[in-house]
């Protein structure tokens, strides 16, 4: 995602990992082979990038490397939705991380959103939390992936267990790329904890929220 690529690279470095960004089909399999984790981000999508995503994802599966999907904008166009669904069909993802609108689109196989942000009607609240948890667990069961739904309240779930995470700051949603940064961080956490996908994903979400809270404190006068 060219919009957020520099911020994501710096976030991965801050986690102690070493980022390399590539979307070229010619060398993507070679690049993927030297990495322990793959973060497929669907921002700035085009057919050439889809080809690279497919090649990189399949190579990572072959090598038993960690793979994360960030389905940016799924539901905002049929092109994006179809591309995301094809990726889920063809590649085994360790984690799928998105906002609630993107995840609902992928779980249902169709949907509409107003862009890369979650629709207001889809907002995860204390009132609909009990209904959403079984929905997310079922999507995890069907995909074999940990599902991370991020927003005001975060859910990180496999088919059996679900972490509900309430931290962070609402102001984080006003910064472009915080979700992309989290996906980069989460991929690093997965690569460092290969036997614990659920816990690694939840730890990344917690760390991002705590970082936001700490940053907010430093921004206050006095």
How does the language model describe each region?
Residues 45-48, 73-77, 155, 172:
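Short, small-residue-enriched loops and turns at beta-alpha junctions
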Residues 49-98:
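Glycine/small-residue-rich loop that forms an oxyanion/phosphate-binding "nest" at active or ligand-binding sites
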Residues 1-69:
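Conserved N-terminal subdomain of the carbohydrate kinase-like
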Residues 163-177:
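Short pre-catalytic strand/loop immediately N-terminal to key active-site residues, enriched for Gly-Thr
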Residues 80-162:
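Conserved phosphate/ATP/ADP-binding segment of small-molecule kinases
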Residues 72-76, 102, 153-154, 206-211:
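Acidic, glycine-rich active-site loops and adjacent beta-strand->loop/helix elements
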Residues 176, 185-222:
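Conserved post-catalytic alpha-helical subdomain immediately downstream of the catalytic base
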